[in-house]
Amino acid sequence: MNDLRMYNVLVRPLVTEKSTMQLEKGNQISFAVATWANKPQIKKAIETIYSVKVEAVQVSNAKGKTKRFGKLEGKRKDWKRAVVRLQEGQSIDLFDQGA
């Protein structure tokens, strides 16, 4: 997988109450990833971009919600969530506090 495609695998980090607790207790970080990405691609992208060792990757597909736009009914995009467990002693600083 080339470098440009690796950056397309990770869409954004997910910051929720649940993901914050997972980060504090279990050294796990949640990401929204591309729907076409599989576990080995996600693992390789995170290890390359953030220079950390990944212990495990869990993925789940989330269906897009049905929403109304006035009279029209539309649907949000389906997306994929990845929960990445890092090895002991590894960490990712997603938000640079020094700026």
Swiss-Prot record:
One of its GO terms (biological process) is translation. Pfam families: Ribosomal_L23 (PF00276). Gene3D superfamilies: 3.30.70.330. Keywords: Ribonucleoprotein, Ribosomal protein, RNA-binding, rRNA-binding. Transmembrane segments: none annotated. GO terms for cellular component: ribonucleoprotein complex; ribosome. The keyword Ribosomal protein applies. It comes from the Bacteria. GO terms for molecular function: rRNA binding; structural constituent of ribosome. InterPro entries: Nucleotide-bd_a/b_plait_sf, Ribosomal_uL23-like, Ribosomal_uL23/eL15/eS24_sf, Ribosomal_uL23_CS. The keyword Ribonucleoprotein applies. NCBIfam families: PRK05738.1-3, PRK05738.2-4. One of the early assembly proteins it binds 23S rRNA. One of the proteins that surrounds the polypeptide exit tunnel on the outside of the ribosome. Forms the main docking site for trigger factor binding to the ribosome. Belongs to the universal ribosomal protein uL23 family. Part of the 50S ribosomal subunit. Contacts protein L29, and trigger factor when it is bound to the ribosome. This is Large ribosomal subunit protein uL23. The gene is rplW.
